[in-house]
């Protein structure tokens, strides 16, 4: 049986009302989501500045109306955290985070046994869930244990520490006095890493002198 014009108009009005309600509800959710995301980012910025950024979040419990207290529970370098919104009830939001990390990145493929230097690695700031262990000393003291592909973050586990100068080796020496620069070859009497002072044998007087390691197989003679 066909509908009368009046019934048809009534059904259309009901459908339109449901559509308007659905659109308004979706708009409310979208607006609420934007406001909540802004709140989370603002709280993170107040606590950590630009050190951390929000990757994702999930509302675990209902958000109370007119909450009066905001409590951030985040530990530095942790990929997870929580934001609590408190009134008479507590709303909890789970956070997924990324931290600003200063890392070494391979500028080109690095092969096993190759020493790190400014030609094959560079420092960059990137965001990661956890920052890898920082180098507590100059990276030129390390050589690759395995092949490290271009663009890869160079982790401490990929490397081994190795002397830049080894006892008994013939090394390059530099002596500076004002504008006078003398370069010669001499024998290392000790092992050493970058920046360390070791004993070397003078080829001129055959006396023991001291030199500071400034590169692989290179020392600067101290006065």
UniProtKB/Swiss-Prot annotation:
CDD domains: SAF_CpaB_FlgA_like
Keyword Lipid metabolism among record annotations: no
Top-rank taxon: Bacteria
Gene Ontology, cellular component aspect: periplasmic space
Keywords assigned: Bacterial flagellum biogenesis, Periplasm, Signal
Pfam families: ChapFlgA
InterPro entries: Flag_basal_body_FlgA_C, Flagellar_FlgA, SAF
Subcellular location: Periplasm
GO BP terms, alphabetized: bacterial-type flagellum assembly; bacterial-type flagellum-dependent cell motility
Protein family according to the UniProt entry: Belongs to the FlgA family.
Function recorded in the entry: Involved in the assembly process of the P-ring formation. It may associate with FlgF on the rod constituting a structure essential for the P-ring assembly or may act as a modulator protein for the P-ring assembly.
Protein name per its UniProtKB record: Flagella basal body P-ring formation protein FlgA
Originating organism: Aquifex aeolicus (strain VF5)
Gene that produces this protein: flgA
